[in-house]
Amino acid sequence: MNGVVIPQTPIAVDFWSLRRAGSARLFFLTHMHCDHTVGLSSTWARPLYCSPITACLLHRRLQVSKHWIRALEVGESHVLPLDEIGQETMTVTLIDANHCPGSVMFLFEGYFGTILYTGDFRYTPSMLKEPALILGKQIHTLYLDNTNCNPALVLPSRQEATQQIVQLIRQFPQHNIKIGLYSLGKESLLEQLALEFRTWVVLSPQRLELVQLLGLADVFTVEEEAGRIHAVDHTEICHSAMLQWNQSHPTIAIFPTSRKVRSPHPSIYTVPYSDHSSYSELRAFVAALRPCQVVPIVHQKPCGEFFQDSLSPRLAMPLIPHSVQQYMSSSSRKTNVLWQLERRLKRPRTQGVVFESPEEKANQVKVDRDSKKHKKENLSPWAGHLERLCPHPLQARKQLFPDFCRKERDEPVLFCDSNKMATVLTAPLEFSVQLQPIDEFLFPETREKIGLESPLLSRGDSGSPARGNQSDCVGCGSPPAHISRAVPLTPESRGLALKYLLTPVHFLQAGFSSRNFDKQVEKHQRVQRSSPAVLSPVDVG
């Protein structure tokens, strides 16, 4: 990856690894070649600065959101804030890099001094006439494209290389020409060849869309048989492809590159056409700028010793106060948090799922299972009366037992067959319980539905229901009209705790088992035989 985070600044150029970016908050893209976009994808969510052409290609090819792309005009200076409040700013100027469509150099000016980042570029003397460089600009740090920084590598200019390609094509007037290219670049070479030989240049639909964006001459087409010059991807040119092409029509292939290419076929030619500066051009460029220091962009090719005599002896690197460095680092971290918050707000909210309580569900399933198991064998006379009123005991309980019990006992709800929560009332079986009649809580429609023609119990003279005193429950002479005598319980009535929850479930789980409950029933029967007691139906909420 040919990118860098400039030390002691919040600037990152062609660097897209956020984990290694540190305090960087301003990200710049020189051009769209793949070795400069490693790590950049559609998930990118930071402001990104580039040229207008690169901005268009970035959105179309990598699907980076337009919300994060900041297109800056080439040849103009732009003031950018270095913190979220705009207290510290810097100036950036974009200069045409003469490398590929949309490629630029960045000139940064701020508290850190003046930094020129060339990216990939092909030097021409006209670059020194740029307004940003012509005013005797003092460059403190020059980040230099050192791809061809090798004294042994002699490269012709692009005009000279173009003439070599023209002469080569003229040697094969009856042949088709395959030009091996990368995904971006050398479109101007294709235009010159089309105009020189008065033929159409056949492109892929993707590259045709690109040349239309660049506004080049109308000499390109996607029709295979329209012209003899075909631009293909460099990976398509191989020995098998050459055999196939030559079977249908005589064909030669040309690689316009400064890289060493091993020719797998005698009809494949390499011409040293390069979009990177040659060694002599780099020397001329550095000598004209006379920076304080030169930093190579391609880290695998150190080249500092080649430019020692071209550095400025009088220019010193600016001193950045430690307080400024701390301030810029802290502000960048705060801004990164704001970016993350903004990105999070743009995401669609995840829909939550409400789960039932596992304990509640387990208790409900257990009680339902036990209730169904003992349905026939554990019916008390009172429960049987309810079943005669309504064929479905569950429906009868829902209709007959409203949630008024909560007001009298305030006990927690442990189980309810319906969606409405209810409170279970319990009382020792030795004593009778005086409760409010159940029929008065029924609406007339409900009473008719379950087959009641008259109230089950008369209300009596008392105004509101109240729990009877325990002293009045045993040995009383004649019960009031609204209290019914308890029917003697039979052995079949065992297991009522699990069926009708006369005892809270957590009591049963805590040791008050059904066996203990059966003992209470037997004890109650003995009391009934010795002294008949009064038992009214138990209200269950």
From Swiss-Prot:
UniProt entry keywords in alphabetical sequence: Chromosome, Cytoplasm, Cytoskeleton, DNA damage, DNA repair, Exonuclease, Hydrolase, Isopeptide bond, Nuclease, Nucleus, Telomere, Ubl conjugation
Cross-link (Glycyl lysine isopeptide (Lys-Gly) (interchain with G-Cter in SUMO2)): 334
Assembly and interaction partners: Interacts with MUS81, MRE11 and FANCD2. Interacts with HSPA2, HSPA8 and HSPA14. Interacts with SPAG5. Interacts with TERF2; the interaction is direct.
Record-given protein name: 5' exonuclease Apollo
GO biological process: interstrand cross-link repair; nucleotide-excision repair; protection from non-homologous end joining at telomere; telomere maintenance; telomere maintenance via telomere lengthening; telomeric 3' overhang formation; telomeric loop formation
Subcellular location, record wording: Chromosome, Telomere; Nucleus; Cytoplasm, Cytoskeleton, Microtubule organizing center, Centrosome
Pfam families given in the database record: DRMBL (PF07522)
InterPro entries, per database record: DRMBL (IPR011084), RibonucZ/Hydroxyglut_hydro (IPR036866)
Domains: entry comment: The TBM domain mediates interaction with TERF2.
Top-level taxon in the UniProt lineage: Eukaryota
GO cellular component: centrosome; chromosome, telomeric region; cytoplasm; nuclear body; nucleus
Record-level Gene Ontology MF annotations: 5'-3' exonuclease activity; beta-lactamase activity; protein homodimerization activity; protein-containing complex binding
EC annotation from Swiss-Prot or TrEMBL: 3.1.-.-, 3.5.2.6
EC category name: hydrolase
Catalyzed chemical reaction(s): a beta-lactam + H2O = a substituted beta-amino acid
Motif placement: TBM: 492-507
UniProt region (Disordered), positions on chain: 455-475
Family: Belongs to the DNA repair metallo-beta-lactamase (DRMBL) family.
Modifications the protein undergoes after translation, according to the UniProt entry: Ubiquitinated, leading to its degradation. Interaction with TERF2 protects it from ubiquitination.
Species per Swiss-Prot/TrEMBL record: Mus musculus
Observed effect of gene inactivation: Embryos are smaller than wild-type embryos and neonates die during the first day after birth. Cells activate the ATM kinase at their telomeres in S phase and show leading-end telomere fusions which are accompanied by a reduction in the telomeric overhang signal.
Function per UniProt: 5'-3' exonuclease that plays a central role in telomere maintenance and protection during S-phase. Participates in the protection of telomeres against non-homologous end-joining (NHEJ)-mediated repair, thereby ensuring that telomeres do not fuse.
